[in-house]
C-alpha cells in the first residue's frame, strides 16, 4: 500500500488504499481497493485499476517511481497521482495514465486526466478554496519540485523533457533530456524546486496543513533531508512565498494532523517509528 483516503467523514464511510499491482508477469500498474470502515475487519475489494502496465526492468538503480497518493475531492471524486515507473515516454503521452494526476469518479470508476508530465508525485493536498492541488514531487538527482495544479485546466509539468535535477549516473538520455527550463519548452514552471547542490535537503514526500498558522501554510516532509519545511503558498500566482526548514532527524514518509489532540503524527521510516510533532506557540 502506498496511500489511503476516506470517502467521507461519516461513520459509514469507506476506506480506500492505493497500491502497486502485478497484473501480468513482471508488469505492474497502479490500483485502488476499498472497504467498509470497520475497526474489527476490513474486507477490501478491487475498485480501480489502470489497464496498462509497465514492465519492470532490473537495473543498478531500480526506482519504481509509482506515485500512488490519494486525496478526496468534494462530492464523489477522488484524486490519484501516478509516476512514470521509469518509462520515460509515458508522462507526455495523453493516451497513457502514467506520469499523471487523475480524477476518478467514486460511483463509476471512470477517470479523467487533470495534469501531465509528472515523475513521481507523492505529496498531495487540496487547497482551502478547492480549486488547486499542492503537489510535492520526487525529482531524479536533485530537482525535487513543489507544484501547484489548477483543477480547472489540464497543464503539462514537463517531465522528462524538463527538470532541474540530473540522472543518477550523470549521463544524458535523448528520451529524457532534462532541460533546465520548463517555460522555454511550453511547460509549467514549478512553484519551488531543489537543485543538485541542495540534494542533501530534498526527498520531499508528504504534505499536511500547518494548522498553527492557518491560511495557505503547509508542512512538507522530506526523506533524505530529515527535514520538515514550513511553506507558505500563493495559489493565485503559483508561488512559494516563504520556506523554512525544521530539522527532525529522521526520514519522514508521511505526516498527518490529529485534530482532537492538536498535534501531528510523523511516520519515520528509518527508525522505524511514529513520532509526534507539536507546535510551541510561546
Residue ranges and their predicted role:
Residues 238-259:
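Conserved blade-ending motifs and adjacent loop-strand segments that build the rim/top face
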Residues 4, 11, 84-241:
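Beta-propeller domain segments
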Residues 50-62, 147-155, 174, 251-258:
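Hydrophobic transmembrane alpha-helix bundles
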Residues 1-87, 123-139, 197-236, 259-281:
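Acidic, Gly/Ser/Thr-rich repeat motifs that build Ca2+-stabilized beta-propeller blades
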Residues 48-52, 58-62, 112-117, 194-196, ...:
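Surface loop/turn motifs at the tips and blade-to-blade linkers of beta-strand repeat domains
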Residues 34, 69, 100-103, 119, ...:
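Basic side chains
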Amino acid at each position: 500500500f502506498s496511500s489511503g483516503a476516506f470517502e467521507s467523514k461519516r461513520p459509514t464511510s469507506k476506506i480506500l488504499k492505493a497500491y502497486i499491482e502485478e497484473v501480468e508477469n513482471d508488469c505492474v500498474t497502479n490500483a485502488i481497493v476499498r472497504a467498509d470502515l470497520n475497526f474489527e475487519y476490513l474486507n477490501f475489494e478491487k475498485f480501480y485499476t489502470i489497464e496498462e502496465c509497465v514492465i519492470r526492468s532490473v537495473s543498478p538503480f531500480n526506482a519504481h517511481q509509482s506515485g500512488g497518493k490519494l486525496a478526496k475531492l468534494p462530492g464523489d471524486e477522488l484524486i490519484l497521482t501516478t509516476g512514470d515507473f521509469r518509462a520515460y515516454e509515458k508522462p507526455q503521452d495523453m493516451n497513457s495514465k502514467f506520469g499523471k494526476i487523475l480524477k476518478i469518479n467514486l460511483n463509476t470508476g471512470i477517470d479523467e486526466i487533470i495534469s501531465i508530465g509528472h515523475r513521481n508525485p507523492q505529496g498531495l493536498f487540496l487547497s482551502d478554496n478547492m480549486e488547486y492541488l499542492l503537489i510535492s514531487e520526487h525529482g531524479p538527482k536533485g530537482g525535487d519540485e513543489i507544484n501547484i495544479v489548477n483543477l480547472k485546466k489540464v497543464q503539462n509539468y514537463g517531465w522528462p523533457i524538463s527538470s532541474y535535477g540530473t540522472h543518477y549516473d550523470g549521463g544524458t538520455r535523448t528520451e529524457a533530456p532534462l532541460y533546465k527550463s520548463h517555460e522555454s519548452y511550453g511547460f509549467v514552471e514549478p512553484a519551488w524546486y531543489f537543485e543538485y547542490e541542495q540534494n542533501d535537503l530534498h526527498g520531499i514526500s508528504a504534505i499536511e496543513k500547518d494548522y498553527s498558522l492557518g491560511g495557505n501554510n503547509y508542512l512538507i516532509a522530506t526523506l533524505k533531508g530529515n527535514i520538515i519545511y514550513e511553506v507558505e503558498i500563493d495559489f493565485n500566482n503559483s508561488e512559494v512565498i516563504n520556506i523554512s526548514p525544521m530539522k527532525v532527524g529522521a526520514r519522514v514518509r508521511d505526516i498527518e494532523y490529529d485534530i482532537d489532540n492538536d498535534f501531528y503524527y510523523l511516520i519515520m521510516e528509518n527508525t522505524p517509528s511514529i513520532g509526534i510533532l507539536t507546535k510551541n506557540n510561546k
